[in-house]
Amino acid sequence: MFDSGSFRDPSGRILRQDGKILRAIFDQGVANYAAARDADIYRRAVSRGRLVDLRETDTSLLAGIDPALRVVLEHPRLPFISYPYEWTFSGLKTAALLHLDLHLELLADDFTLSDATAYNVQFEGTQPIFIDHLSIVPYEDGALWAGQRQFAMQFLNPLILWAKRGVAPNTWYRGNVEGIAPEDLTKLLGWREKASFTVLAHVVAQSWTYKRGVQAGLNAKTNTARKLSKPAFI
């Protein structure tokens, strides 16, 4: 059966079958998967303890689930599944650092992460591990990080709210799985808190930029046309 948490990605889905954890990769995701596999990206990330292990298996295991099926992966079953709204401050911070460390390592090999959702991280004991192989895609020169706002909403902003105001974001997370938008967080912070470089650069500036973009009627096509050098990206 399909895992209820993997419904968003058109490139692949997670399934549970006969005690196995399987990942179906469809037409839309097979090129990026093959590029990362052939560049040995997955194996290096697994060896560093960043990424959950994987192995290709017979597509006949999932015969008939979708005509676009191209590859089937099997993953080890994690002993425990948790969610960001259940994590402690240190757990959320550790998951955020894993995400950044993995992303920097991928960029060094000309790959990147297509998103930055906290739900792509699980824990083995106290160690965070990345679980979404299909969000690892080839880096395109000049590309902006599509997951920047998502990283802020699901990692940085909840941590800032926790650190600056002493308010745990767990209940907020349960009500909005996308996390805390910069536009909302700015309303909760005082002027002294907004004056810190981290908050000014990653909350206030993002909030202003987003509001300006909405008011100007900017669309996704306009934003993706902008270019950013790799050193600036990093």
What residues fall within each predicted segment?
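ATP-binding glycine-rich phosphate-binding loop
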Residues: 1-18, 57
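ATP-binding glycine-rich loop module of kinase domains
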Residues: 11-35, 85
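N-terminal auxiliary segments of SAM/dcSAM-dependent transferases
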Residues: 24, 148-234
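Conserved kinase catalytic-core helix
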Residues: 36-49, 88-114, 158
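Polybasic, positively charged surfaces/segments
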Residues: 48, 81-98, 164-171, 175-185
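Conserved structural core of kinase catalytic domains
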Residues: 52-98
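Short, glycine/charge-rich beta-strand/loop segments that flank catalytic centers
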Residues: 55-62, 112-124, 173-174
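Catalytic activation segment of kinase domains across protein kinase-like and atypical kinase folds
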Residues: 112-166
